[in-house]
Amino acid sequence: MKPSPASTPVGSTLRISLVCNTAWAIYTYRQGLIRTLVARGVEVTVIAPRDRTFDLLAQMGCRCIDLPVASKGTNPRDDLRTLWALYRHYRAIRPHVVFHYTIKPNIYGSISAKLAGVASVAVTTGLGYVFIQSSRTAQIAKKLYRFAFRFPREIWFLNRDDMAAFTEQHLLVHPERARLLHGEGVDLEQFAPTPLPESNQVTFILIGRLLWDKGVGEYVDAARQLRARYRDVRFQLLGPVGVDNPSAISRDEVAAWEREGIIEYGGEAHDVRPFIAAADCVVLPSYREGVPRTLMEAAAMGRPIVATDVPGCREVVTDGINGLLCEAKSATSLAEKLAQMLDMSGAARREMGERGRQKVAAEFDERAVVERYTDLIRNLTGVSL
């Protein structure tokens, strides 16, 4: 079904809102979109829990509004607070289009937008615990998805597996509104190829929020196994710790791994490029993903990858071509693939990285993704950007 354009008076400023459970994710994954919208005169509002990226988003030209979201919680009162807060913001801002990301904004934001008479788009950035677990909470979340997803004008999925999961489990009342975005893209100029480090020591790095669901525990266990067999190898972690997520890893747990001498923790970084450039291989043993930005960035910079054979990761990695795929939730399988990478020659790793750059350039160019956004905005508002 093609939605009818929203009313946008000639000469008025186009207002677009981006809503997520972390401002960090908006800043990290959607800079290209924000720059394009701001440069074309759009009033961009980011609605998310306040964090240190609010200032950075403001510097880019965004208006930022704090949002109460209990990502870890299942208290209905907290969720109603989120729904009511979004409804009030939408009534006050009157955005022409709202894009929702992550579970709670997708569910409660879609409902709030409908109540406020605002056009919305749901972007499923990865299904997370809803499809990893079979708990009562996960079953309730699926029912909420089915109810809320009758309201967005379009529902975007980042990979075919997630789209198929929603379709097969009958969570889409209007399946004709589903679209495949195929990842959120990467800036190919910003993440340019760099040569592999010239060192006899091989460095692995896992970049992302430190969550058990990202396979951090398996990564640490695999590192522990391999350190007993290989001398010249380093295992690094980079990303926020103790985040508001049911699967969060604490700083104390990371500190214990550091004391044991298994891993090196680099903290957080706004710019991950120096860390990717200093690594020989990027690792992501996640249980499930949308299409992981980390892997797109790594491939764009010419790094071979070791990842799990799960939705999202296998969108970026073709086993044996630009990286290696291992079993999910298996430190043994991960250790085997990391050992295989260690036993390769530097030339073989370089060739894998070069093929990864070619794949990302062909399939994940951020410019094509931004064009999908601007095309939809035009269809919904009648305004060409």
Residue spans of the language-model regions?
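Glycosyltransferase donor-sugar binding loop
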Residues: 48-52, 207, 234-249
